[in-house]
Amino acid sequence: MTKVLVVYCSMSGNTRAAAEVVAAGAKGAGARVTPKEGSQARPQDPLECDAAAPGSHDAFSYMGGALKDFLDRAFYPTQGHVTDKPYAAFVTHGGEGKEGKSIESLAQVFKLKRIAPTVSVQGEPARQAIADLEELGVTLAAATRTWGNPPRLVSHRPHADDSLGVAS
Protein backbone atom coordinates (compact mmCIF):
# COMPACT_ATOMS: atom_id res chain seq x y z
CA MET A 1 0.00 0.00 0.00
CA THR A 2 1.32 3.42 -0.89
CA LYS A 3 1.91 6.09 1.76
CA VAL A 4 1.11 9.78 1.41
CA LEU A 5 2.40 12.33 3.93
CA VAL A 6 0.13 15.35 4.36
CA VAL A 7 2.07 17.92 6.40
CA TYR A 8 0.59 21.33 7.10
CA CYS A 9 0.64 24.51 9.17
CA SER A 10 -2.71 26.03 10.14
CA MET A 11 -3.61 29.11 12.16
CA SER A 12 -7.38 29.52 11.72
CA GLY A 13 -8.26 25.90 10.98
CA ASN A 14 -8.77 26.42 7.23
CA THR A 15 -5.52 24.70 6.30
CA ARG A 16 -6.24 21.83 8.69
CA ALA A 17 -9.64 21.42 6.99
CA ALA A 18 -7.92 21.49 3.58
CA ALA A 19 -5.38 18.88 4.77
CA GLU A 20 -8.21 16.60 5.90
CA VAL A 21 -9.81 16.79 2.43
CA VAL A 22 -6.48 16.03 0.69
CA ALA A 23 -6.01 13.06 3.06
CA ALA A 24 -9.54 11.81 2.38
CA GLY A 25 -8.95 11.96 -1.38
CA ALA A 26 -5.74 9.94 -1.09
CA LYS A 27 -7.35 7.42 1.28
CA GLY A 28 -10.30 7.04 -1.09
CA ALA A 29 -7.83 6.21 -3.86
CA GLY A 30 -6.29 3.44 -1.77
CA ALA A 31 -3.32 5.14 -0.11
CA ARG A 32 -2.37 5.04 3.54
CA VAL A 33 -2.26 8.65 4.68
CA THR A 34 -0.39 10.29 7.53
CA PRO A 35 -1.66 13.84 8.16
CA LYS A 36 0.62 15.80 10.51
CA GLU A 37 0.85 19.35 11.74
CA GLY A 38 4.31 20.69 10.85
CA SER A 39 5.43 20.91 14.47
CA GLN A 40 4.53 17.22 14.99
CA ALA A 41 6.20 15.95 11.81
CA ARG A 42 9.50 14.14 12.16
CA PRO A 43 12.56 14.79 9.96
CA GLN A 44 12.45 11.18 8.70
CA ASP A 45 8.78 11.37 7.64
CA PRO A 46 9.65 12.23 4.01
CA LEU A 47 11.76 9.06 3.85
CA GLU A 48 8.83 6.93 5.01
CA CYS A 49 6.30 8.11 2.42
CA ASP A 50 5.85 7.64 -1.30
CA ALA A 51 4.44 11.13 -1.94
CA ALA A 52 3.94 14.33 0.03
CA ALA A 53 1.37 17.11 0.23
CA PRO A 54 2.74 20.16 2.06
CA GLY A 55 0.17 22.81 2.94
CA SER A 56 0.17 26.16 4.68
CA HIS A 57 -1.76 29.27 5.47
CA ASP A 58 -0.54 32.64 4.22
CA ALA A 59 2.05 34.07 6.61
CA PHE A 60 2.87 37.43 5.05
CA SER A 61 3.11 35.87 1.56
CA TYR A 62 5.24 32.99 2.88
CA MET A 63 4.51 29.54 4.28
CA GLY A 64 3.71 29.25 7.99
CA GLY A 65 6.53 28.84 10.48
CA ALA A 66 5.70 25.26 11.54
CA LEU A 67 5.91 24.01 7.94
CA LYS A 68 9.15 25.93 7.32
CA ASP A 69 10.60 24.56 10.57
CA PHE A 70 9.70 21.01 9.53
CA LEU A 71 11.33 21.45 6.12
CA ASP A 72 14.45 22.88 7.78
CA ARG A 73 14.66 19.89 10.15
CA ALA A 74 14.03 17.38 7.34
CA PHE A 75 16.50 18.72 4.79
CA TYR A 76 19.79 17.13 5.84
CA PRO A 77 18.35 13.76 6.96
CA THR A 78 16.59 13.37 3.59
CA GLN A 79 19.15 14.99 1.28
CA GLY A 80 19.65 12.82 -1.79
CA HIS A 81 17.01 10.29 -0.70
CA VAL A 82 13.81 11.98 -1.90
CA THR A 83 14.88 13.08 -5.38
CA ASP A 84 11.93 13.01 -7.79
CA LYS A 85 9.51 11.91 -5.06
CA PRO A 86 6.04 13.21 -6.08
CA TYR A 87 4.55 16.18 -4.27
CA ALA A 88 1.68 18.59 -4.68
CA ALA A 89 1.07 21.58 -2.42
CA PHE A 90 -2.03 23.32 -1.12
CA VAL A 91 -2.40 26.75 0.47
CA THR A 92 -5.09 28.77 2.19
CA HIS A 93 -5.13 32.54 2.30
CA GLY A 94 -7.20 35.66 2.74
CA GLY A 95 -6.58 37.23 -0.63
CA GLU A 96 -3.17 37.00 -2.27
CA GLY A 97 -2.15 33.34 -1.97
CA LYS A 98 1.55 33.87 -2.71
CA GLU A 99 2.78 31.41 -0.07
CA GLY A 100 2.57 28.57 -2.59
CA LYS A 101 5.68 29.97 -4.30
CA SER A 102 7.74 29.53 -1.12
CA ILE A 103 6.65 25.90 -0.79
CA GLU A 104 7.47 25.26 -4.44
CA SER A 105 10.91 26.87 -4.03
CA LEU A 106 11.82 24.63 -1.10
CA ALA A 107 10.44 21.57 -2.89
CA GLN A 108 12.92 22.33 -5.67
CA VAL A 109 15.74 22.42 -3.10
CA PHE A 110 14.64 18.94 -1.93
CA LYS A 111 14.50 17.95 -5.64
CA LEU A 112 10.92 16.74 -5.33
CA LYS A 113 8.80 16.33 -8.47
CA ARG A 114 5.68 18.49 -8.64
CA ILE A 115 2.86 16.41 -10.11
CA ALA A 116 0.02 18.93 -9.93
CA PRO A 117 -0.40 22.69 -9.64
CA THR A 118 -0.68 24.10 -6.13
CA VAL A 119 -4.30 24.25 -4.98
CA SER A 120 -4.99 27.74 -3.64
CA VAL A 121 -8.00 28.18 -1.36
CA GLN A 122 -9.27 31.59 -0.31
CA GLY A 123 -10.76 31.36 3.17
CA GLU A 124 -12.60 28.27 4.34
CA PRO A 125 -12.68 25.47 1.74
CA ALA A 126 -15.98 25.65 -0.20
CA ARG A 127 -17.45 23.27 -2.80
CA GLN A 128 -15.00 23.84 -5.69
CA ALA A 129 -12.00 23.99 -3.36
CA ILE A 130 -13.07 20.75 -1.69
CA ALA A 131 -13.29 19.05 -5.09
CA ASP A 132 -9.85 20.40 -6.07
CA LEU A 133 -8.27 19.32 -2.77
CA GLU A 134 -9.80 15.86 -2.98
CA GLU A 135 -8.51 15.50 -6.55
CA LEU A 136 -5.05 16.53 -5.31
CA GLY A 137 -5.14 13.61 -2.86
CA VAL A 138 -6.28 11.21 -5.57
CA THR A 139 -3.49 12.44 -7.86
CA LEU A 140 -0.88 11.90 -5.14
CA ALA A 141 -2.14 8.38 -4.47
CA ALA A 142 -1.97 7.55 -8.18
CA ALA A 143 1.52 9.02 -8.55
CA THR A 144 2.85 6.77 -5.81
CA ARG A 145 1.98 3.72 -7.88
CA THR A 146 4.49 4.70 -10.55
CA TRP A 147 7.21 6.60 -8.64
CA GLY A 148 10.55 4.91 -9.09
CA ASN A 149 9.14 2.25 -11.41
CA PRO A 150 10.42 2.34 -15.00
CA PRO A 151 8.10 1.23 -17.80
CA ARG A 152 7.68 -2.54 -17.83
CA LEU A 153 8.78 -4.35 -20.98
CA VAL A 154 6.15 -6.71 -22.30
CA SER A 155 6.99 -9.71 -24.44
CA HIS A 156 4.45 -9.83 -27.23
CA ARG A 157 4.46 -9.58 -30.98
CA PRO A 158 4.74 -5.87 -31.81
CA HIS A 159 1.94 -4.33 -33.82
CA ALA A 160 2.54 -1.74 -36.50
CA ASP A 161 1.74 1.04 -34.03
CA ASP A 162 3.62 -0.58 -31.11
CA SER A 163 7.08 -1.33 -32.44
CA LEU A 164 8.84 -1.04 -29.07
CA GLY A 165 6.57 -3.36 -27.09
CA VAL A 166 6.62 -1.08 -24.03
CA ALA A 167 3.67 -1.04 -21.65
CA SER A 168 2.91 2.06 -19.69
Where are these predicted regions, by residue range?
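Short polar catalytic/cofactor-binding loops
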Residues: 9-13
